[in-house]
Amino acid sequence: MPDYLVVLQAAWIVRKARSVEDAMNIAVAEAGKKLNPDLDFVKIDVGDTACPKCNSPLKAVFMVAGVALVGLIFEMKVFNAKSPEHAAKIAKYEIGKRMPRIPLEVIEVAEIE
C-alpha cells in the first residue's frame, strides 16, 4: 500500500495579539502544543494567499482590534493508506481529534515514492 503526504488547512483564532507576526507565532505555537507529543511529526506553517489585485503572495492572516484569524497549514505523512481519500480521512481524523473545535479542510494529497 502506498504512502501519502496530506496537506490540511485550518482557521485559527488568536486573541490579544500585538501584531500580525505575533499572531502567526502564537497560532503556530498553540497548534504545536495541541499536537505534541503524539503528533510531533506534523509540520505546521502559516498558509499563503494571493492578493486579489496584484496576485502577489501574502501570509494568510487577518487582524482587527487585537484579534487575528490565521490560516494554518498542516502537513502529515500517512503510511500504508488504501487510497488518497483514505489517507485524507486518516490525517483529518488524527489531527481533528486533538483539535475538535478547529475547522480542517484537505487541500492536497500526494503519493510519496
From Swiss-Prot:
<comment type="similarity">
    <text>Belongs to the UPF0212 family.</text>
</comment>
<protein>
    <recommendedName>
        <fullName>UPF0212 protein AF_0282</fullName>
    </recommendedName>
</protein>
<dbReference type="Pfam" id="PF04475">
    <property type="entry name" value="DUF555"/>
</dbReference>
<dbReference type="InterPro" id="IPR007564">
    <property type="entry name" value="UPF0212"/>
</dbReference>
